[in-house]
Design a protein with these regions (language model features):
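Conserved redox-cofactor binding core of oxidoreductases
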Residues: 107-199
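N-terminal glycine-rich phosphate/pyrophosphate-binding loop and immediately adjacent elements
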Residues: 1-110, 114-117
Length: 199
């Protein structure tokens, strides 16, 4: 039996677990990160909608019981189980919660605002501060400029503007500019799929 000793053990390698483990290691703590999922395969099958969305290739075996506000009943939800947790599947959208979202929480948006900024820097978010008409206060410059819209997205954007709406480019934590890492291919399988190139 392995008798290794650690200063800290973090359970789960999703957003929360990986960031906590990173902070502990950077502070000099010997840290073990436990994950029940396997590595995402990142093969051609990971771009197959049937495999990922219908057959649920990475579906976990332990249900989470979720009760939505105002509902009487709990729902069973099965999270994807892979190294990286749902950070592997979320599509890069990096919006901040709004101050009103914290009304029932034991802390306020302002308490978390500096940590949002740290996370945006760490993840290399592309975005344009001030573009979101409902943006919470204190959003500074993103590490990278917002990405150019694809032709279909540009058409939707311009149509929204013509209708008097205020469309904006969603801040994205996807690599479009750091040539030392794989760059986004601009495929159509971001949200809900593991990125095949890990952009």
């Amino acid at each position: 039996m392995n008798s290794a000793h650690y200063d800290a053990v973090v359970v789960g390698s999703g957003f929360g677990g990986s960031l906590v483990a990173r902070a502990l290691v950077r502070a000099g703590f010997k840290t073990a990160l436990l994950e029940r999922g396997q590595w995402a395969r990142r093969d051609d099958v990971d771009w197959d909608q049937s495999e990922i969305l219908i057959k649920q290739r990475y579906r976990g075996t332990s249900p989470l019981l979720i009760k939505q506000y105002g509902s009487r009943d709990f729902q069973r939800v099965y999270a994807n189980e892979v190294v990286g947790g749902n950070s592997v599947f979320y599509g890069g959208a990096s919006l901040r919660l709004r101050p009103a979202d914290f009304a029932r929480w034991p802390f306020a948006y302002g308490d978390l605002a500096p940590y949002y900024t740290q996370a945006e820097q760490l993840m290399g978010v592309h975005g344009e501060a001030g573009a979101d008409p409902h943006e919470p206060p204190g959003v500074g410059a993103y590490p990278h400029d917002a990405i150019e819209l694809s032709a279909p997205a540009r058409r939707i954007y311009e149509t929204g503007q013509a209708l008097g709406l205020q469309p904006f480019k969603i801040p994205l934590a996807i690599n479009f500019s750091d040539a030392t890492r794989p760059l986004c291919l601009r495929c159509i399988t971001c949200d809900g799929f593991p990125c095949k190139v890990e952009a």
